[in-house]
Amino acid sequence: MSPTKSEKNGAVTVYTQPGLPASTQQAEPRGDMPSFAIALGGGGARGIAHIPILEALDELGIRPHIIAGTSIGALMGAAYASGISGADMRSYCSELFSKRVAVIKRLFSRLNSEDNSFTGFLSKTMNATMPFFPGERVLEALLPPELPATFEGLKIPFLAVTTDFYMQTQYVISEGPLIPAIAASAALPGVLRPVELDGRVLVDGGFVNPLPFDVFKGEADVTAAIDVSPGPSRGKDGKKQFPSLMEAMVGSPQIALNTIIREKLKTNAPDILIRPHIGHFLVLDFFKFEEIFTASEAAKEEFKRACEKAITRHRKTLGRG
């Protein structure tokens, strides 16, 4: 059963029925443990910082009730919802990005599958109606092979947040083909091609909801949001990093996304908000994964402490603390 939707202020599409579609239903947690809803925000390569947070969930023995993700957060969220542990995600990421030449060859072998020549591929991507890289092919080259084909094959309910280009509204996907939904959530115009799905043209969900902690609608006791979208900052040495052309194209929209997050937090905040100190990394710094992991360790410990406090509070409300 699909959820009904309504629009508020012409800005976002929201669920109006109590509960979620059948494909995202999950039993309440047992005993005195609260249920957790985890929102993973967008931020390009900074999204690698989501992995230590997911490791923390495993270390605490917390199985999320539901996960939502935007852009890179959708990619990470789907992988975790498929049953891949945080530790295995770290290993996969390290293996993938430690071999720069191999990953580039792997990527372009997928891209060339749409045409028998690289020249043909470039010709297509320069066409105004087919901008740049096809996201589904990119994901097929980079994602772990364990991912199921559909949302229904996931072990944890998952919501992919996208933007309907023509309606200019949020569109949340919770069922059907998985890879196209993730590709749509991460389809940054000018970099990845928009995705046609459900009769809609979908682009990066960050344009309407870069930190989707408000899509759960009371589905869990504790809502945690991981914000990996800090704006450009000075490097570790205190000097400004002058962005490349691509970094300027990809990173400039982050200014608007951060504004959206700030305005959301003024009226509605998650129970737990974690912001790893990763502002000195650029959105395309995927090959700096080890440095991002290291920079995220403090946020991981902060998240664990926040979860433990939330569990204690929940037990006290039950009279068991």
Regions found by a protein language model. Give the residues of each.
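Patatin-like phospholipase
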Residues: M1-T70, A78-G321
